């Protein structure tokens, strides 16, 4: 179909066009029901990463899943009534202690009560020989004292807090076990709170879905304020808002079919599409008001042929910038890149299909005064060299602080600060000095060989020397055998059945594999965690298991360190690809490598300024902020494209270079500023979800979008005035 015929169709049958497009949009949008939210940090690592592969193997062989920790508080948690409540809750959640989770989904449960029961089960005179909670307060305190340092992972020194830890199977119904746990703690008088990976993940999932519902109306509100400031016209508001709303519905409907897994960063897609989609509508609407023809079809054809082309170029380059995230080794980045890429395409389609019919139906004819933009254009032209020099100085200063840019993977930064589960988990971490996350070591060897057990015990002692709490079957054996490892295998044949009956032995049926659980200190920096994981692995490497093998540590801490190790490499990789592809696209679009290179100069400046922004705002690269550079390449290039496209258009009309540059800034100035501010307004909504990682993301990306605008308006003219530009 020729462009003139397409333009005529849009304005001659506007209601029909809008009706058909609405039907298609809601048919696609119906697939949004397939979307689901994940909050596990492990999804940020590629499946072939050794830490993930080992954890997957352990989870499959041992059916290991998430953990639930019940945080117990009281004036004296060793009070018999409190201990009875702990015992009651434990039995309600884990009624079948010996089933390995096959019936109740709980592989093992550990609390101060289970340790007291173990001590009490020892033969006289060390215990009563019965696996039960003693009724004597004296006996309870004696058993706790005999536990030594082992009690510190479950009991605070002031006896005002303790914990019950449940390790769950990986095939458990999360909602069902959480409901069961909530019901259990509600039936006792002692204050108890659910924390741990499963409650945290559930809280973050639920909150993330609510946040998406919050962001949308806020983004609309903030963007509407900007639009009303510029246009003061409800018609204009309707014209610029409907297309991005349709594009959001189309995007999430598409994701519901092809990539239904959402993560925390997916929340930003809504704000990005509102901001960028509104930009496209603004460009077409403002150009429409410039045309003076009485024939609306010819005016629409003109804006589609000129500004429409610039919007198409912006769409293509923005899609390229976002699609560079799809070559990431991190699955959530791939899905985020796909969502943004498809969303921008739908934004362009929605804008082209809907804006002309809306202009026709609403008879929009508002004229904009541009005298202020004439003065702005004059300032940009007259001071371009000074502005360029200032930009270069800032760039040099930014590069000087590049070594100060850090990387960080902090799960709590992805969690809303006002969520009770998160607050209690952080409080628990501070009081017990550990994160509560599961870190494990897989050991293969003959577990009935005392030498193997001694090697494991020696390794655990080295772990404890560096502040790591470790527990394995060896600790259970020593507790039953009066603090010693048996010298003969025959004694082990009698001890293992007792441990298995108590649910305290992570060993396989052949006694050839076992797991060591670790509790690492909380509150460390990512660099300290990296050094700690490295030290743990050094201890593992130095441990010799007779005819066996010990694998490196895996679990929450090891995964966070592994993610942190690939963050910088992933950003450089996606950034290089986006710059290369955008440059290639601009060469094809402009049919000139010179114009392509010049158009990218503002983005080059902004990317060089990024380290300075990160250091100034005290923000590290994370699984959220890592995508910013690629987003800026895709979005920030738009401003340069519109100026370049308008400059070439004015040159074709016969204007001299200086006047053409001035005219380009003058005519596109309003649209560019309005587009930048609407994008900022849309993104600003994300700041109100009270998630630190997303707030950092918003601060950096807003700063870089505004600087992209400044670069296009004030720095680009200096290069277009060069003699080589014709």
For each predicted feature, which ranges?
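Feature of extramembrane
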Residues: 1-226, 230-235, 367-572
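Membrane-embedded transmembrane helical bundles of large multi-pass transporters/channels
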Residues: 1-43, 129-130, 145, 149, ...
